[in-house]
Swiss-Prot record:
The keyword Chaperone applies. Keywords: Chaperone, Cytoplasm. InterPro entries: Chaperone_TorD, DMSO/NO3_reduct_chaperone, HscB_C_sf, TorD-like_sf, TorD/DmsD_chaperones. Its main location: cytoplasm. GO terms for cellular component: cytoplasm. This is Chaperone protein TorD. PANTHER family: CHAPERONE PROTEIN TORD, CHAPERONE PROTEIN YCDY. Involved in the biogenesis of TorA. Acts on TorA before the insertion of the molybdenum cofactor and, as a result, probably favors a conformation of the apoenzyme that is competent for acquiring the cofactor. GO terms for biological process: protein complex oligomerization; protein folding. Transmembrane segments: none annotated.
Length: 197
C-alpha cells in the first residue's frame, strides 16, 4: 500500500517533474547508474511500485552496456515527448483535451500561477499546459498544506489528461522502457493520492 507523508510526496513529485521535463545529461545518467538513487528506488519499491522500479533498474543496466548511453536515453525522450502528436505522447494538456476543457484548464492554471507568484525559467519556454507546470503547481499546493485543493487538482486537472497521455506513452516503442516506467510511477502515485483522499 502506498503511504506517503507530505514531505515524501513533494520530494517524489519534484523528482518526477525534473526527470520528465528534459533529457538527462550524461552526468545525471551516471549518477543513476552509480547508485545515487538506490535509496529512492528501494523506498518506491516498498510503496507497491516494485514492478515499475525494476523496469527502471533494468533500463539503466541495459544502458550501461551501450557506448553512448546518454544519447540513447535522449533519443528515447525525443521519441516519446518531442516529435509530432502522431508519433509522440506530447506532454501538453492541449494534446488530449477538448478546446472547452483546455480553456478551463489554462484559465485555472494561469490563476494559480498568478496566485502563488510562480515564474518559470524563460529559457524553457514551456506554455502553461506543459506537464512540468502542472507538477510544479501540485508541489506548491502540497507545500501549502491544502490537501483538499491538491486532491481536486489531481483528479480534475492532472488525471483528466495524464491517463490518455500515459496510455500513449506505453504504446510507443523505444530502446529502453525507462520513461514508460517513470510515467507509470507518476500515474500510480496520483491515482493512489486521490483514492486516499
Amino acid at each position: 500500500m502506498i503511504t506517503l507523508n507530505t514531505e515524501e510526496k513533494i520530494f517524489i513529485y519534484s523528482w518526477l517533474k525534473n526527470i520528465l521535463s528534459h533529457e538527462l545529461t550524461e552526468q545525471q545518467l551516471q549518477q543513476y547508474q552509480q547508485g545515487v538513487f538506490t535509496p529512492l528506488f528501494d523506498f518506491l519499491s516498498e510503496q507497491d511500485l516494485a514492478k515499475q522500479i525494476n523496469t527502471v533498474r533494468n533500463s539503466l543496466m541495459q544502458l550501461s552496456n551501450l557506448p553512448l548511453a546518454h544519447l540513447e536515453l535522449a533519443a528515447d525522450f525525443a521519441q516519446l515527448f518531442l516529435l509530432n502528436g502522431e508519433n509522440s505522447a506530447l506532454p501538453y494538456a492541449s494534446a488530449y483535451l477538448s478546446e472547452k476543457e483546455l480553456n478551463q484548464h489554462i484559465a485555472f492554471i494561469d490563476h494559480l500561477l498568478f496566485k502563488y507568484q510562480l515564474k518559470f525559467d524563460h529559457n524553457l519556454r514551456e506554455p502553461s499546459d506543459h506537464l512540468a507546470v502542472y507538477l510544479e503547481l501540485l508541489i506548491t499546493l502540497e507545500k501549502s498544506g491544502q490537501k483538499e485543493k491538491s486532491f481536486n487538482f489531481i483528479q480534475h486537472y492532472l488525471l483528466a489528461w495524464l491517463i490518455p497521455f500515459n496510455k500513449k506513452v506505453q504504446k510507443i516503442k523505444t530502446e529502453t522502457s525507462f520513461y514508460q516506467a517513470i510515467t507509470e510511477i507518476l500515474i500510480t502515485l496520483l491515482n493512489k493520492n486521490v483514492k486516499l483522499s
